[in-house]
């Protein structure tokens, strides 16, 4: 059983905005320290950014307007906490406590992820999809239901009828769709709106990639300040995650679909 949402789901819009601001921070300095929370809906986008490098309201507003349209932007930017900054002063260390797992992706999860991408390539609007064995549920906004019935004749499509979706119908918040992003690898920490020093980003990516490579479950934990995880220097894990983020096109692109 698996649920997948597309990049125009309000929660993913929030993730994408958060990712865009992290990308902006990395354009300004090589290793920023940043954590961004986004709440979006009904014409307003609220953003709080704790950051070592100033982004400015103009940069944040430009990202919101590009991704979500001409919304009113409420932007709060504060410096990173001094104790957290000191943790990274002498080298790359885990930026927070956390538990993590990587689980090999199942065929069912791969199948639904592809269905979601196929539909989104034709209808780039808010959508949510579920696959539970033979039961396929497709909720796709702004679509021609008959088109989907022709391709997926056995699916349950828009059970309550046609709908519009988007941030004028539903609110979105950062890191609220981790099940969609990570499948069975979801634990407590969110992937989006954070720099690579955050274990929620780098260790989650590392554990997921290791599980796909070994085809075995991976479980890890860390304490803030740790300089090794899984017997490897944390700096090495950060570079693995950095290369992965680069391979998908940056933090904003990563936020579109997550790891699955």
Q: For each of these PLM feature ranges, what is it?
A:
Residues 1-260:
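A domain-level signal for the structural core that forms small-molecule/cofactor-binding pockets
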């Amino acid at each position: 059983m698996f649920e997948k949402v597309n990049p125009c789901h309000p929660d993913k819009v929030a993730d994408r905005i958060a990712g865009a601001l992290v990308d902006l921070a990395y354009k300004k300095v090589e290793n920023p320290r940043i954590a961004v929370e986004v709440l979006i809906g009904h014409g307003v986008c609220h953003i709080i950014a704790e950051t070592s490098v100033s982004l400015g309201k103009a940069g944040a507003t430009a990202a919101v307007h590009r991704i979500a349209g001409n919304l009113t932007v409420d932007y709060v930017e504060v410096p990173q906490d001094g104790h957290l900054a000191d943790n990274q002063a002498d080298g790359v260390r885990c930026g927070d406590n956390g538990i993590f797992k990587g689980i090999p992706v199942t065929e069912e999860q791969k199948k639904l992820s592809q269905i979601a991408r196929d539909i989104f390539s034709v209808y780039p609007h808010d959508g949510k999809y579920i696959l539970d064995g033979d039961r396929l549920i497709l909720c796709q906004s702004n679509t021609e239901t008959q088109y989907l019935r022709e391709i997926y004749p056995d699916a349950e499509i828009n059970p309550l009828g046609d709908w519009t979706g988007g941030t004028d119908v539903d609110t979105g918040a950062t890191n609220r769709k981790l099940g969609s992003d990570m499948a069975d690898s979801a634990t407590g920490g969110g992937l989006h709106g954070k720099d690579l020093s955050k274990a929620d980003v780098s260790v989650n990516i590392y554990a997921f990639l290791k599980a796909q490579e070994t085809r075995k479950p991976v479980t890890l934990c860390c304490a803030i300040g740790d300089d090794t995880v899984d017997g490897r220097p944390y700096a090495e894990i950060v570079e693995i995650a950095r290369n992965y983020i680069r391979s998908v096109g940056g933090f904003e692109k990563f936020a579109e679909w997550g790891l699955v």
